[in-house]
Each structure stands twice: as C-alpha cells, then as structure tokens.
Amino acid sequence: MYFRYLALLLFSLTGMSFTIIDVRTEAEWNTGHLEGALHIEWQDILEISSDIPKDEEIYLYCRSGNRSGKATKILLDAGYINAKNAGSISEASKLLNTKIID
C-alpha cells in the first residue's frame, strides 16, 4: 500500500496523469462517485476510450473491489499494462486522495 501512495505522489509531482474509472452500475454511480472519474460498467470496460494510452496508469473501483478486479484483469489482458484495482469506492477515495461527489 505504501508503494501506491509513493507512485501517486510521483505522478502528481511530475505532472504525469492517470485515469480513474468507476465500473459500478449507473444507479450506483448516481449515488456518488469519485471526482474526475469516468463511468464504464465493468462488463463494458473494453469500450474504454482509445484516447487513453495503453501505458497510462488506470485505477478502477466499484462497491467492494470484486467488479473492479474483473475489469482490471480484462484491461490487463487487452494490453493496458498499468491497470490497477483500487478496490471499493472508499478505498479508492483514500488511495487516490480524491473526494466522493454526487
């Protein structure tokens, strides 16, 4: 876990970017999501924008970490080498130092 925080600090200090993806349902998304997150339900994850480079850091989250784990594996298998499961929405919020908004 400590390494993840160091990696995020490095990204912020160097201006490198990362993408946050909420893989929950639309109803769950509407109850609150991380600021700046994209919404793509886990089973549709390969509809990810071609504007996102395959080497970009991508953090995925859901309610518990289960669906985001599945989506992470799909992205890794598709060549997105830096896809990471950030766990639940609250875990992702802490990990990425990003607030939950309505």
Model-derived features: where do they sit?
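Short, surface-exposed ligand- or partner-binding patches at beta-edge/loop junctions that are enriched
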Residues: 61
